[in-house]
Amino acid sequence: MNNTIINSLIGGDDFIKRSNVFAVDSQIPTLYMPQYISLSGVMTNDGPDNQAIASFEIRDQYITALNHLVLSLELPEVKGMGRFGYVPYVGYKCINHVSVSSCNGVIWEIEGEELYNNCINNTIALKHSGYSSELNDISIGLTPNDTIKEPSTVYVYIKTPFDVEDTFSSLKLSDSKITVTVTFNPVSDIVIRDSSFDFETFNKEFVYVPELSFIGYMVKNVQIKPSFIEKPRRVIGQINQPTATVTEVHAATSLSVYTKPYYGNTDNKFISYPGYSQDEKDYIDAYVSRLLDDLVIVSDGPPTGYPESAEIVEVPEDGVVSIQDADVYVKIDNVPDNMSVYLHTNLLMFGTRKNSFIYNISKKFSAITGTYSDATKRTVFAHISHTINIIDTSIPVSLWTSQRNVYNGDNRSAESKAKDLFINDPFIKGIDFKNKTDIISRLEVRFGNDVLYSENGPISRIYNELLTKSNNGTRTLTFNFTPKIFFRPTTITANVSRGKDKLSVRVVYSTMDINHPIYYVQKQLVVVCNDLYKVSYDQGVSITKIMGDNN
């Protein structure tokens, strides 16, 4: 060994007390044994809107503690005609609400969307929850006996505060019966389909078949001590209103803000959906592919099957077609002599006033080339130059034909319209499918009457993505960075006498062009506050809401 290194050790001061970094004193832990346990639930239809509810009762004299809940859901075989697929992460999107209760009341609960948000950075959990090409790609049935989807089982990890530090954070039963209750979303929320699919029959026959699994711990001579948990509370603002308020805030560890689109029962039909592939490019490619069959037509005469308002022109020999102030170049090879190439110049258009700006989807294409196949009677497109974006793909079909549009907005063929898809994904955020468009330009949070935080940029969203390693478009103020379990979480604390017991959020929505149909997508502000509770085991399992620093 090098002399310099040897001398640096020999010359060290031996009188200083030093900690051993080459070994630790092993401690003998509490004697326990874990086991995977599964049980079936009792199904009812007692939800607020006759939703299905599953209740699982856990009471075993040998189970001292539990955590890591996993819900198994069976998806049936799907047969029939039409286009059909499950929304990505279908297992999570089946869930409306989860609660864990004892005889003393609810211990912990969470909305389905917040559960999904908490697990969005766990790729394994997302995969097992129903993210696969077999489930999510749009499949087609051509006859009533065609199998569109094979039966499958998905597994939903229900992330709870009892999982944070395994045995330390586990929920101790304290000889109590624990009930886990899962409220499910309507079946319409978890499927994507076209109008030819017999959804009414599918909905009647669909039955949620859940099973709950968890890790149960048998512990010898357990010494139970009180602990703290965070419980999320969600408030949804009024439609298109920029404010939302969470009341009775006494000790909060974080506050999250995001927006959701509100489509209603008539605005959930869209032109396309990519299925399993979920990148922004996949949404755009699926949309462009659907439009091209109506946009460029090879026919032996003026195309038929379109509304009278459709403006379809024959492409001249030079291939250049002018649409208002834009030119589109079209070149299709191998066209038979008795046929011509036509371009649809007002496929989808929107405007709020005549003789003013018109949002015309046809104008977003600048060059289209391809080859016509006489055998298949279809055009194989080789190169498409366009400016279609994720917002275009996210426009509900109903907005093209809404009363706000002074033009005949949807001029596609009847055949194309029949392929439109009903999408009722309950966890969409923002105003586009990927939540790329940041529609909040300013955020202000007040605690009582005092301004707690304000921003003109998305810094709270950036920090949320960095800290959680997830990209879900949520803006979060975090008041607690204390290591969990071993310390009481840090909170923003109320002062009721000064009116500081509510968090009020106000946003300024980004300016958008009123001639763009996406401007008219209704939205709701969502605020989620994590309240701090103390878990006690004196007489069964119970929780107490923390009311201040001294609790």
Curated annotation (Swiss-Prot):
GO cellular component: membrane
Any one Pfam family match given in the protein's UniProt record, by short name: Pox_Rif
Main location class: membrane
InterPro entries, per database record: Poxvirus_Rif-R
Mode of membrane association: Peripheral membrane protein
Induction remarks: Expressed in the early phase of the viral replicative cycle.
Location(s) in or outside the cell: Membrane
Any GO BP annotation: response to antibiotic
Keywords: Membrane
Assigned protein family: Belongs to the orthopoxvirus protein OPG125 family.
Oligomeric and partner information: Interacts with the late transcription elongation factor VLTF-4/OPG110. Interacts with the late transcription factors VLTF-1.
Primary role: Acts with RNA polymerase to initiate transcription from late gene promoters.
UniProt protein name: Scaffold protein OPG125
Annotated source species: Monkeypox virus
Gene symbol of the encoding locus: OPG125
